[in-house]
């Protein structure tokens, strides 16, 4: 096991969940725990959030759902976002997992197994409103509207869609997607809806519908957020929506001639701060006293400009610590910034502790890699990625410690 410790503060995650519940006054709030809870532990997070009355958990694959079901009672809903495939349909039924059906092929598969088992099977439908990554397209939705037998044997519980730019509060595409979604829902008046991811929650109540699906916000990503109590745009519509024939409505909906003027700061907005639940610490395992012009690490990419004290920490790119941190980035020792020097190798990194008091530099001294001084979002900005990737890349070798 690694000498590094990854601390996950479940209380912080629960606090973030409660904050999201407060914002979503008229909607339920689920939790996205795919990719092992963004690398932090899906089972532990789910068990903690159940205590906050969370009843809906979203995973990506059937395997993730099965692992989660082993620790959650059958009355808790587990949604599989990637849907159903022939090879795993029976497992979804066995473990009481609900697929999010993303195309007509998946609907046909789920209906086939409904007939095979002689029972009505639950499902969600995913409508593509503009992310264009997954989900039923307008032609497929039209087929469902015109032939309801395509859903025979299925218990359609929710219709969902996914925002493409929800973290950009002034992006007019959010409202374009919202209006597409609303038009589609007109044809399914008795079905509940889910639209808001983390960013969508902060766009305002119009985006909340019946169930919100936060992931990143639970884990403290994009932590300082402006929340709108209403839409973040002035709107002018020129749309002939009186004729709600399926083809006309669906085909025109994406281009309803919406003219949007972003309003920033948001009208009726307020600011909230999410808590970072993640701390990664690594001990100093070696110290080198080097003279001027000494080379450090592979390919001698860093050369000391003075007599230096260089410490070694036991983590590297095999643990998800990107090589892009080579000779850039920082760690913290007793709240003091310490630069990373030389190449990040598979299992080790070097830091320059020359400027620290000698009393703070010793074998076993802990350096904070991720924490309140250097959050996942800050780390991401240094290496040109996003906080999601930082968290989901956290290696399996870290000793995980859960704080309740």
From Swiss-Prot:
Which keywords appear in this protein's UniProt record, sorted alphabetically? Isomerase, Pyridoxal phosphate
Gene3D superfamilies the record matches: Alanine racemase, Lyase, Ornithine Decarboxylase, Chain A, domain 1
Tell me which residues bind substrate.
Answer: 133, 346
- One GO CC annotation: cytosol
**Which PANTHER family does the protein's record reference?**
ALANINE RACEMASE, ALANINE RACEMASE, CATABOLIC-RELATED
Note the NCBIfam families from the entry: PRK00053.2-3, RPE1
> Can you name this protein?
Alanine racemase
